[in-house]
UniProtKB/Swiss-Prot annotation:
Keywords: Lyase, Metal-binding. Disulfide bonds: none annotated. Homotrimer. GO terms for molecular function: 4-hydroxy-4-methyl-2-oxoglutarate aldolase activity; metal ion binding; oxaloacetate decarboxylase activity. It is an enzyme of class 4 (lyase). CDD domains: RraA_family. It catalyses: 4-hydroxy-4-methyl-2-oxoglutarate = 2 pyruvate; oxaloacetate + H(+) = pyruvate + CO2. It comes from Halalkalibacterium halodurans (strain ATCC BAA-125 / DSM 18197 / FERM 7344 / JCM 9153 / C-125). Divalent metal cation. This is Putative 4-hydroxy-4-methyl-2-oxoglutarate aldolase. Coiled coil: none annotated.
Length: 210
């Protein structure tokens, strides 16, 4: 990515995923079962997509080898949590390579060590069993992750509330809408802060719109 591209996508770090979701009418949010391993995990970056067969992660290693710094590895493991797509060894290599984070529609393992990496990891679950490496899988292809279609280069944004996807080409429009939603939310919160009358007026307006 160019410095201009990095500066642009960095703006999404200051906006909650809830506001980005609202800007996209909630249509591109991954299933709520895909959660951050650490509550403070946050990830923003273009998707480097991976499609794997159940219990096989060689394609993940290929994607890491080809990834550019700042990419988010997004893995369609079809929700299978019987075998881990990655553990602390693979995740540690990804961090060293400058990969921005992992989003896995499946499981990881080595939880304590993985948490200690301070590397953004979003996954459906955890398990003990390792994956095989038979080579079955595809990289940089359209996938479905967490019930949402994702194409290579789509912008991935994740925080404590979950993960959402901004389709490539819509980033600027979504950024402006999300910024406005964030500003409106903050103004509304300031207006009612410790103000019983303002709260009652707001509730009245919502319950009995004119």
């Amino acid at each position: 990515m160019s410095q201009a591209e990095i500066d642009f996508i960095t703006q999404f770090r200051t906006i909650p995923t809830t506001c980005i979701s609202d800007a996209l009418d909630g249509l591109t949010n991954l299933t709520s079962t895909i959660k951050p391993l650490n509550e403070n995990d946050q990830v923003v970056g273009p998707a480097r997509t991976v499609q794997v067969a159940s219990g096989d992660n060689l394609a993940v290693l290929k994607a890491m080898y080809e990834a550019s710094p700042g990419d988010v590895i997004v893995i369609d493991a079809k929700g299978d949590c019987t075998r881990a797509i990655a553990g602390d060894f693979v995740l540690g290599m990804a961090k060293t390579l400058g990969i921005a984070g992992f989003v896995v529609d499946g499981a990881i393992r080595d939880i304590r060590a993985s948490k200690a990496l301070n590397f953004p990891i979003f996954c459906r679950g955890t398990t003990i069993a390792a994956s095989k490496k038979t080579g079955i899988g595809n990289i940089n292809v359209p996938i479905s992750c967490g019930g949402v279609p994702i194409r290579p280069g789509d912008l991935i944004v994740g925080d404590a509330d979950g993960v959402t996807v901004i389709p490539k080409g819509q980033e600027e429009n979504v950024l402006q809408k999300a910024k406005k939603k964030q500003a409106d939310d903050e103004a509304r919160e300031r207006a009612i802060s410790d103000n019983v009358m303002a709260i009652r007026a707001y509730l009245e307006k919502m319950i009995h719109p004119s």
